[in-house]
Curated annotation (Swiss-Prot):
Protein name: 6-phosphogluconolactonase
EC numbers for this chain: 3.1.1.31
Gene this chain is encoded by: PGLS
Localization terms from the record: Cytoplasm
SUPFAM superfamilies: NagB/RpiA/CoA transferase-like (SSF100950)
Associated pathway: Carbohydrate degradation; pentose phosphate pathway; D-ribulose 5-phosphate from D-glucose 6-phosphate (oxidative stage): step 2/3
Chemical reaction(s) catalysed: 6-phospho-D-glucono-1,5-lactone + H2O = 6-phospho-D-gluconate + H(+)
Cellular component per GO, a single term: cytosol
Organism for this UniProt entry: Bos taurus
Amino acid sequence: MAAPAPRLISVFSSPQELGASLAQLVVQQAACCLADAGARFTLGLSGGSLVSMLARELPAAAAPAGPASLARWTLGFCDERLVPFEHAESTYGLYRTHLLSKLPIFDSQVITINPALPVEEAAEDYAKKLRQAFQGDSIPVFDLLILGVGPDGHTCSLFPDHPLLQEREKIVAPISDSPKPPPQRVTLTLPVLNAARTVIYVATGEGKAAILKRILEDKEENPLPAALVQPSAGKLCWFLDEAAARLLTVPFEKHSTL
């Protein structure tokens, strides 16, 4: 069994400082990936509070790179709710409105689900699109995945004690019984999450403190979904604000612009 990915925990004094640093890291990762002619940068996005955080910080951070650089980005989604893109619960819809409208990124650069399909077919269709975008990879290898973590320890649409945690064959799985609405979703599976070159978890607020202590410090017999993300050949980073990190006793790096 491969050794767990090296883990870096960074703690910021506020969500605003965290967001600014996250945006800079995305841009730096992109620049490293695009240093070779003909290369591209592949980014997997999650929803929730990450949408507003990236919408606030990423356009300005990415502006110096220019449209030619951003034209070499490919975006996908770590999970998605099976609702129309115009629906308030659509992760892609929210990013399209609040972030992508501010960036010179074309629809052809964004890999989305087809929300008109039944959930099983939507998962198969999204998997097919990913395989087309990541030709040559038996499992899609994203340069960077940005993940959130729920107060129950879920990440993407992988929930505690759910059978999808055992999925090893599919790269995308349907879920029809999500404990968090809406119930029908499409999610990347653990093999894809663990194939990424870099994974960044983002968590803010005191409401995440207890679950983060379990994920980052406890050795549980039945690990929470977020604790199962251990990139086999990549980096694992945690970006937390002080409120979310308040119960941690493990070493972490403290960041502040004050």
